[in-house]
Design a protein with these regions (language model features):
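Active-site PLP attachment segment
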Residues: 17-50
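PLP-dependent enzyme catalytic core of the Aspartate aminotransferase-like
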Residues: 134-138, 146-185
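Active-site pre-lysine segment of PLP-dependent enzymes
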Residues: 1-24
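Short hydrophobic/aromatic beta-strand micro-patches
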Residues: 42, 116-120, 157-159
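Conserved PLP-dependent catalytic core of the aminotransferase class-I/II
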Residues: 66, 70-138
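Short, ordered loop/turn segments at secondary-structure junctions
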Residues: 1, 45, 65, 144-146
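A short glycine-threonine-serine/GTX helix/turn-capping micro-motif
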Residues: 55-64
Length: 185
Protein backbone atom coordinates (compact mmCIF):
# COMPACT_ATOMS: atom_id res chain seq x y z
CA UNK A 1 0.00 0.00 0.00
CA UNK A 2 3.04 2.27 0.22
CA UNK A 3 2.75 4.85 -2.52
CA UNK A 4 -0.97 4.21 -3.03
CA UNK A 5 -2.81 4.54 0.30
CA UNK A 6 -2.62 7.37 2.81
CA UNK A 7 -1.83 11.04 2.43
CA UNK A 8 1.23 11.48 0.26
CA UNK A 9 1.28 7.72 -0.36
CA UNK A 10 2.43 6.98 3.18
CA UNK A 11 0.73 3.59 3.18
CA UNK A 12 -1.64 1.55 5.30
CA UNK A 13 -0.71 3.00 8.73
CA UNK A 14 -1.42 6.54 7.51
CA UNK A 15 -4.58 5.42 5.70
CA UNK A 16 -6.01 4.00 8.94
CA UNK A 17 -4.68 6.81 11.15
CA UNK A 18 -2.39 4.60 13.23
CA UNK A 19 1.03 5.67 11.93
CA UNK A 20 2.19 6.86 15.36
CA UNK A 21 1.34 3.49 16.94
CA UNK A 22 3.24 1.23 14.52
CA UNK A 23 6.69 0.02 15.57
CA UNK A 24 7.89 -1.31 12.21
CA UNK A 25 6.71 -0.83 8.64
CA UNK A 26 7.81 -3.14 5.86
CA UNK A 27 6.95 -2.65 2.22
CA UNK A 28 7.95 -3.65 -1.27
CA UNK A 29 9.71 -1.58 -3.89
CA UNK A 30 8.12 -3.79 -6.54
CA UNK A 31 4.88 -1.87 -7.02
CA UNK A 32 4.32 1.89 -6.56
CA UNK A 33 7.90 2.65 -5.59
CA UNK A 34 9.67 2.02 -8.84
CA UNK A 35 8.31 -1.36 -9.88
CA UNK A 36 11.70 -2.98 -9.51
CA UNK A 37 12.71 -5.36 -6.74
CA UNK A 38 13.54 -5.34 -3.08
CA UNK A 39 11.84 -3.76 -0.16
CA UNK A 40 12.42 -1.90 3.06
CA UNK A 41 11.77 -1.90 6.77
CA UNK A 42 11.52 1.33 8.71
CA UNK A 43 11.05 2.13 12.37
CA UNK A 44 12.71 3.64 15.42
CA UNK A 45 16.50 3.73 15.27
CA UNK A 46 16.89 1.24 18.15
CA UNK A 47 14.68 -1.35 16.41
CA UNK A 48 16.44 -0.97 13.08
CA UNK A 49 19.84 -1.37 14.76
CA UNK A 50 18.59 -4.54 16.47
CA UNK A 51 17.37 -5.91 13.13
CA UNK A 52 20.70 -5.10 11.50
CA UNK A 53 22.48 -7.18 14.14
CA UNK A 54 20.01 -10.05 14.59
CA UNK A 55 17.96 -10.48 11.42
CA UNK A 56 19.31 -13.39 9.37
CA UNK A 57 17.54 -12.29 6.16
CA UNK A 58 19.19 -8.88 6.50
CA UNK A 59 22.59 -10.30 7.43
CA UNK A 60 22.68 -12.69 4.49
CA UNK A 61 21.12 -10.45 1.83
CA UNK A 62 22.83 -8.31 -0.74
CA UNK A 63 22.23 -4.59 -0.79
CA UNK A 64 19.95 -3.09 -3.39
CA UNK A 65 21.74 -2.03 -6.55
CA UNK A 66 22.19 1.78 -6.51
CA UNK A 67 19.97 2.21 -9.58
CA UNK A 68 17.06 0.49 -7.77
CA UNK A 69 17.57 2.62 -4.67
CA UNK A 70 17.68 5.76 -6.84
CA UNK A 71 14.49 4.75 -8.67
CA UNK A 72 12.74 4.13 -5.35
CA UNK A 73 13.83 7.53 -4.00
CA UNK A 74 12.55 9.25 -7.15
CA UNK A 75 9.28 7.32 -6.90
CA UNK A 76 8.86 8.40 -3.27
CA UNK A 77 9.36 12.03 -4.32
CA UNK A 78 6.73 11.61 -7.04
CA UNK A 79 4.11 9.90 -4.85
CA UNK A 80 4.48 12.46 -2.06
CA UNK A 81 2.92 15.01 -4.41
CA UNK A 82 0.86 12.63 -6.52
CA UNK A 83 -2.54 12.68 -4.83
CA UNK A 84 -4.17 13.31 -8.23
CA UNK A 85 -2.51 10.12 -9.55
CA UNK A 86 -3.77 8.10 -6.57
CA UNK A 87 -7.30 9.47 -7.00
CA UNK A 88 -7.27 8.55 -10.69
CA UNK A 89 -5.83 5.11 -9.93
CA UNK A 90 -8.55 4.36 -7.40
CA UNK A 91 -11.26 5.57 -9.79
CA UNK A 92 -9.86 3.37 -12.56
CA UNK A 93 -9.66 0.39 -10.19
CA UNK A 94 -13.28 0.92 -9.12
CA UNK A 95 -14.40 1.15 -12.74
CA UNK A 96 -12.52 -2.02 -13.72
CA UNK A 97 -13.86 -3.93 -10.70
CA UNK A 98 -17.39 -2.90 -11.68
CA UNK A 99 -16.94 -4.00 -15.29
CA UNK A 100 -15.47 -7.39 -14.37
CA UNK A 101 -18.16 -8.03 -11.75
CA UNK A 102 -20.87 -7.09 -14.27
CA UNK A 103 -19.45 -9.72 -16.64
CA UNK A 104 -19.90 -12.31 -13.89
CA UNK A 105 -16.36 -12.71 -12.59
CA UNK A 106 -15.91 -13.35 -8.87
CA UNK A 107 -13.58 -10.75 -7.37
CA UNK A 108 -11.99 -10.48 -3.96
CA UNK A 109 -13.70 -7.42 -2.49
CA UNK A 110 -11.61 -4.33 -1.95
CA UNK A 111 -10.88 -0.77 -2.92
CA UNK A 112 -7.35 -1.01 -4.23
CA UNK A 113 -5.60 -1.42 -7.58
CA UNK A 114 -4.67 -5.09 -7.11
CA UNK A 115 -7.71 -7.04 -8.28
CA UNK A 116 -7.82 -10.81 -7.69
CA UNK A 117 -10.20 -12.63 -10.05
CA UNK A 118 -11.15 -15.89 -8.34
CA UNK A 119 -11.25 -18.97 -10.57
CA UNK A 120 -10.81 -21.83 -8.10
CA UNK A 121 -9.15 -24.34 -10.41
CA UNK A 122 -5.39 -24.02 -10.97
CA UNK A 123 -5.48 -25.28 -14.55
CA UNK A 124 -8.18 -22.76 -15.47
CA UNK A 125 -6.17 -19.92 -13.89
CA UNK A 126 -3.06 -20.94 -15.84
CA UNK A 127 -4.95 -21.42 -19.10
CA UNK A 128 -6.82 -18.14 -18.71
CA UNK A 129 -3.59 -16.22 -18.01
CA UNK A 130 -2.03 -17.79 -21.12
CA UNK A 131 -5.05 -16.95 -23.28
CA UNK A 132 -5.20 -13.38 -21.98
CA UNK A 133 -1.54 -12.97 -22.89
CA UNK A 134 -2.40 -14.09 -26.42
CA UNK A 135 -4.98 -11.29 -26.40
CA UNK A 136 -2.30 -8.81 -25.32
CA UNK A 137 -3.22 -8.68 -21.63
CA UNK A 138 -0.53 -9.65 -19.13
CA UNK A 139 -1.86 -11.07 -15.87
CA UNK A 140 -0.43 -13.52 -13.38
CA UNK A 141 -2.16 -16.74 -12.36
CA UNK A 142 -1.74 -17.91 -8.77
CA UNK A 143 -2.45 -21.38 -7.44
CA UNK A 144 -1.37 -23.71 -4.64
CA UNK A 145 1.02 -23.44 -2.81
CA UNK A 146 0.99 -19.64 -3.26
CA UNK A 147 -2.71 -19.54 -2.34
CA UNK A 148 -4.84 -22.22 -0.61
CA UNK A 149 -5.96 -25.22 -2.68
CA UNK A 150 -9.15 -24.50 -4.59
CA UNK A 151 -8.57 -20.73 -4.51
CA UNK A 152 -6.60 -20.25 -7.73
CA UNK A 153 -6.89 -16.80 -9.18
CA UNK A 154 -5.64 -14.29 -11.67
CA UNK A 155 -4.27 -11.05 -10.30
CA UNK A 156 -4.63 -7.76 -12.13
CA UNK A 157 -2.29 -5.02 -11.00
CA UNK A 158 -3.26 -1.54 -12.16
CA UNK A 159 -0.96 1.42 -12.55
CA UNK A 160 -1.73 5.13 -12.58
CA UNK A 161 -0.35 5.05 -16.13
CA UNK A 162 -3.11 2.75 -17.44
CA UNK A 163 -5.59 4.58 -19.65
CA UNK A 164 -9.32 3.98 -19.84
CA UNK A 165 -8.85 2.69 -23.40
CA UNK A 166 -6.37 0.09 -22.14
CA UNK A 167 -8.76 -0.98 -19.40
CA UNK A 168 -11.62 -1.24 -21.90
CA UNK A 169 -9.41 -3.48 -24.02
CA UNK A 170 -8.66 -5.62 -20.96
CA UNK A 171 -12.38 -5.93 -20.16
CA UNK A 172 -13.10 -7.02 -23.73
CA UNK A 173 -10.32 -9.64 -23.53
CA UNK A 174 -11.61 -10.91 -20.18
CA UNK A 175 -15.10 -11.20 -21.66
CA UNK A 176 -13.85 -13.14 -24.69
CA UNK A 177 -11.56 -15.49 -22.80
CA UNK A 178 -13.92 -15.89 -19.84
CA UNK A 179 -16.72 -17.03 -22.16
CA UNK A 180 -14.39 -19.22 -24.19
CA UNK A 181 -13.28 -21.06 -21.03
CA UNK A 182 -16.82 -21.13 -19.59
CA UNK A 183 -15.79 -19.09 -16.57
CA UNK A 184 -18.61 -16.63 -17.30
CA UNK A 185 -21.77 -16.87 -19.41
Amino acid sequence: ATGVLGKGGRGTPDHFGVAGRIDLVTSTLGKALGGAAGGFTTGRKELIELLRQRSRPYLFSNSLPPVIAAAALKAIALVEHGDHLRVNLMEQAGWLRGQLAALGFTLVPGHHPIIPVMLGDASIATHMADRLLQEGIYVVGFSYPVVPKGQARIRLQLSAAHTRAQLERAVAAFATVGRELHVIK
